[in-house]
Amino acid sequence: MDKTLINELGDELYQAMVQRETVTPLTSRGFDISVEDAYHISLRMLERRLAAGERVIGKKIGVTSKAVQNMLGVHQPDFGYLTDAMVYNSGEAMPISEKLIQPRAEGEIAFILKKDLMGPGVTNADVLAATECVIPCFEVVDSRIQDWKIKIQDTVADNASCGLFVLGDQAVSPRQVDLVTCGMLVEKNGQLLSTGAGAAALGSPVNCVAWLANTLGHFGIA
């Protein structure tokens, strides 16, 4: 895919985000788009966000469960960039109707690092050594793709369907909790909506972070 089209699609997704409008799936438009093309589109979208004054504060790993991978026909996760415009503190109101289009909520685990991880060759032990703490996180994903009709290239291009997220207020050392068996409950007004465990994410959330570091290492990014 040539750079002109990549920039046009990245600009289109950025404008969709700003104007809170959806676009037709990129994969339905009759041209070939690879996952690598999609990452370049997401970087163009990120360039527009940074030019508007946002700054990168972290990264998001998506498509970590076997169920979602099977749905999208892939065998690996994807990633996107988190900016300071996306984060909210525990107890702080989120202006969802003002910022998002078709939100969905998910429970996550956030890793706060005390030093960069640069792949390839990053191991689980490296991840634990580099982690200051882990924090429960409430992610509200969003898609600029119409009706969430996404293939893997669509969600990758759309910054891994990043929306907003809330960091919890209880931080613990990753060595003080079993991240594989650690469970999470998502409730709404006291009603249980979903449950999950760390093992559902590539066998362990630590595996996810190692995957991300090693994947980014191929691009020279820590």
From Swiss-Prot:
This protein's UniProt keywords: Aromatic hydrocarbons catabolism, Lyase, Plasmid
GO molecular function, one term: 2-oxopent-4-enoate hydratase activity
Gene Ontology biological process: benzoate catabolic process via hydroxylation
Biochemical pathway: Aromatic compound metabolism; benzoate degradation via hydroxylation
UniProt-listed PANTHER family: 2-KETO-4-PENTENOATE HYDRATASE, ACID HYDRATASE
The name this protein goes by in its record: 2-hydroxypent-2,4-dienoate hydratase
Enzyme class: lyase
Family from the record: Belongs to the hydratase/decarboxylase family.
Superkingdom of origin organism: Bacteria
SUPFAM superfamilies cross-referenced by the UniProt entry: FAH (SSF56529)
Known function: Conversion of 2-hydroxypent-2,4-dienoate into 4-hydroxy-2-oxopentanoate.
InterPro entries found in the cross-reference section: Fumarylacetoacetase-like_C (IPR011234), Fumarylacetoacetase_C_sf (IPR036663), Hydratase-Decarb/MhpD_sf (IPR050772)
Ranges in a coiled coil: none
Residues spanning the signal sequence: none
UniProt-listed Enzyme Commission number(s): 4.2.-.-
Gene Ontology annotations for the cellular component aspect, listed alphabetically: cytoplasm
